[in-house]
Amino acid sequence: MAAKRRVSAAKDKWKLKQWYVIYAPDFFGGVEVGLTPADDPEKVLNRVVEVTLKDITGDFLKGHVKLYFQVYDVKGQNAYTKFKGMKLARSYIRSLVRRRTTRIDGIFNITTKDGYKLRVMAMVIAARRIQTSQERAIRKIMQEIIYKKAEELNFKDFVLEAVNGKIAAEIAKEAKKIYPLKKAEIRKIKVLGEPEVAA
């Protein structure tokens, strides 16, 4: 009997839940990216949803770009999100790193023009084994371009240029002057802090 009551209580609890529609941030088009159930709108707040750039743009070539959005506001049945981070799928990264190539990684903590603090992880794959001095030169190029972009762009524009490959393309353009490249990528972004809003 106790087991039946537990099952019945679980069913009743599920019946009380409502579905909330989750929307991407405005600068990603504000499109619907998922549904989530909850018996209280407060429980929807801070939930994180993972989607791919393909889900948002319809571009099948962007399925390896994972985006993370966090719910910050609920109005009625609608849940609105903010960008929390991105990363490339591990399988995609593995496909780039082959024998006799060199992977150069850079991790940079930046502050955007409008005060958002981000950790940006960039990656360059050289077509062959390269010298340590060449690695250092390429890493310096990565740093200079990412820092310059942070100074010039607000949070939304920086994220879009990173996610859409524009920053990586600029890194590749300069880094290939040091050594022929296979690929340059922004492989991960994490939001570390947001600007304080004046009371």
From Swiss-Prot:
GO cellular component terms given for this protein: ribonucleoprotein complex; ribosome
Keyword Nucleus in annotation: no
InterPro entries cross-referenced by the UniProt entry: Ribosomal_eS1, Ribosomal_eS1_arc, Ribosomal_eS1_CS
Keyword terms: Ribonucleoprotein, Ribosomal protein
Superkingdom, natural source: Archaea
GO BP field: translation
GO MF, any single term: structural constituent of ribosome
Family: Belongs to the eukaryotic ribosomal protein eS1 family.
Protein name: Small ribosomal subunit protein eS1
Originating organism: Pyrococcus abyssi (strain GE5 / Orsay)
Species classification: Archaea, Methanobacteriati, Methanobacteriota, Thermococci, Thermococcales
